[in-house]
From Swiss-Prot:
Its EC number is 6.3.5.7. Keywords: ATP-binding, Ligase, Nucleotide-binding, Protein biosynthesis. One of its GO terms (biological process) is translation. Gene3D superfamilies: Amidase signature (AS) domain. InterPro entries: Amidase, Amidase_CS, Amidase_dom, AS_sf, GatA. PANTHER family: GLUTAMYL-TRNA(GLN) AMIDOTRANSFERASE SUBUNIT A (PTHR11895:SF151), TRANSAMIDASE (PTHR11895). The keyword Mitochondrion does not apply. One of its GO terms (cellular component) is glutamyl-tRNA(Gln) amidotransferase complex. GO terms for molecular function: ATP binding; glutaminyl-tRNA synthase (glutamine-hydrolyzing) activity. Heterotrimer of A, B and C subunits. It holds the Pfam family Amidase. This is Glutamyl-tRNA(Gln) amidotransferase subunit A. The gene is gatA. It comes from Bordetella avium (strain 197N). Belongs to the amidase family. GatA subfamily.
């Protein structure tokens, strides 16, 4: 057994937890093998910051808790964090030169909760600068690479997270999703990932991009692994003004999502050979039009047929404003980004220009040097649409369109379907640099994910096959508000009869 494969020898997170509890492996052994694996896979550029001593301190604490019988539910489980979450001890850069050397005095709530549950962090993961991008090519520290094909992008903005999970360097990873940044890299790297309902997971300590859109979510090999992570990550946080205290009739607290998952699973188990009988799957015509490549369409269609074999009913629906989500998003998100990123001025923290003659020049030079091209592009768009004379014509119109998009989803859920399924991305992963001369091409790649984000709905990506050049394809499963538990249970039923989520670049080559 190779050292890099140690944590994979015990199956999923539940299997790994059992192995740790039975002392068949220690948290320190897992951490050491994970660090060695990350070092051996340095060519992926998935990790930006690794500090072995910080990792081993956490691992020793997990082993001590296991020995004392006080271990949390994730004690000893090796994970890593997208570098959009601030972390005490590790640098927190958001993939930007602006924050190249920034050390946070506190942990983000997501980091804090996972660490309190005993998870052991191997480090910080690469991402598009300030989470702005669909390929991880906008990182100031170079692009992460797709483990399935090193010439391909891993997706973005949580590309390092998806690459690390796909290469099985970690058992799971955190990500953020503003317009598809968990779901898209999960799809392109052949792993599972979920964006929960907006407000379910605390944004405290998440470096902000679009405040009304940003939501944290995990990436992992399987739906059950996502459950283990998301159930710990979720819950009300008074430090986050956008955090929800209640999710319909249940408190927003750890345990809510697991309870919903268990309830759904119990119903499916009682249904026998067709566990999903009665489930209505809405399939939007707009997700299967021009722009969707035949290989992705075929893989998604095969997945839908598998769900039908499990007893689900396919229902044709319409989400008529699907394509309009692109202009709406690229008005609203840049507007919020231009406001959020105004704080990075070289005065309080972040990069400061070495030479300047006065305060104004110091600020302008610091921002010009510290921000990359895509971030500058979005700041300019945001400033423009918020400016006097254009606010009503662009920003307010985009917000009105956002409400209409949310209404389209609610109309579908009200009487037509229980969940919605379709592709995550219109094609498999592009080659690194393929869209360099046309940055808006990456914006179009989010056409199936943006509407979900604008509506604040939960959605996930699960592996469903391979397309051109043997690159992975993901199936998107969209639910109504607070339906994370049921989404995970539905995905789990699919993963019980397929093995796409178990395949890795190593096993596929073998």
């Amino acid at each position: 057994m190779s050292q890099s494969a140690l944590h994979t020898e015990f199956g999923d997170i539940a299997g790994l937890r059992a192995a740790l509890a039975e002392r068949r492996v220690s948290a320190v052994e897992l951490a050491e093998s994970g660090l060695a694996a990350a070092q051996a896979a340095a060519g992926l550029n998935a990790f930006l910051h690794i500090d072995p001593e910080l990792t081993l301190v956490q691992a020793r604490a997990a082993d001590a808790a296991l020995a004392a019988g006080t271990a949390g539910p994730l004690a000893g489980i090796p994970i890593a964090h997208k570098d959009a979450f601030v972390t005490r001890g590790w640098r927190s850069t958001a993939g930007s030169k602006m924050l190249r050397d920034y050390l946070s005095p506190f942990d983000a709530t997501v980091v804090e909760r996972l660490q309190a549950a005993g998870a052991v962090s191997l480090g910080k993961l690469n991402c598009d600068e300030f989470a702005m991008g669909s390929g991880n090519e906008n990182s100031a520290f170079g692009p992460a690479r797709n483990p399935w094909d090193l010439a391909a992008v891993p997706g973005g903005s949580s590309g390092g997270s998806a690459a690390a999970v796909a290469a099985r360097l970690v058992a799971g990873a955190t990500g953020t999703d503003t317009g598809g940044s968990v779901r898209q890299p999960a799809a392109l790297c052949g792993v599972s990932g979920i964006k929960p309902t907006y407000g379910t997971v605390s944004r405290y300590g998440m470096i902000a991009f679009g405040s009304s859109l940003d939501q944290a979510g995990p990436l992992a090999p399987s739906s059950r692994d996502l459950l283990e992570l998301l159930d710990v990550m979720s819950g009300f946080d008074p430090r986050d003004a956008t955090s929800l205290e209640r999710c319909d009739d249940a408190a927003n607290a750890p345990g809510r999502i697991r309870a919903a998952f268990d309830a759904a699973q119990n119903g499916y188990q009682a249904a026998g050979s067709q566990p999903l009988k009665g489930l209505r799957i809405g399939v939007p015509a707009e997700f299967f039009g021009a722009g969707l490549t035949p290989d992705v369409a075929a893989a998604v269609e095969a997945a839908l047929r598998q769900f039908e074999a499990l007893g689900a009913e396919r229902v044709a629906i319409s989400l008529p404003r699907t394509e309009l989500a692109i202009p709406a998003y690229y008005v609203i998100a840049p507007a919020e980004a231009s406001s959020n990123l105004a704080r990075f001025d070289g005065v309080r923290y972040g990069h400061r220009a070495a030479e300047y003659s006065d305060l104004n020049e110091m600020i302008s030079r610091s921002r010009a040097e510290g921000f990359g091209d895509e971030v500058k592009r979005r700041i300019l768009i945001g400033a423009y649409v918020l400016s006097h004379g254009y606010y009503d014509a662009y920003y307010l119109q985009a917000q009105r369109l956002r409400r209409l998009i949310a209404q389209d989803f609610q109309r579908a859920f009200a009487g037509q379907c229980d969940v919605i399924m379709g592709p995550v991305a219109p094609s498999v992963a592009k080659n690194i640099g393929e869209n360099r001369d046309d940055p808006t091409a990456d914006w179009l790649a989010d056409v199936y994910t943006l509407g979900v984000s604008l509506a604040g709905l939960p959605a996930m990506s699960v592996p469903c096959g391979f397309g051109a050049a043997g690159r992975p394809v993901g199936l998107q499963i969209i639910g109504n508000y607070f339906d994370e538990g049921r989404l995970l249970a539905i995905a789990d039923r699919y993963q019980q009869v397929t093995d796409w989520h178990q395949r890795t670049p190593a096993t596929q080559d073998a």
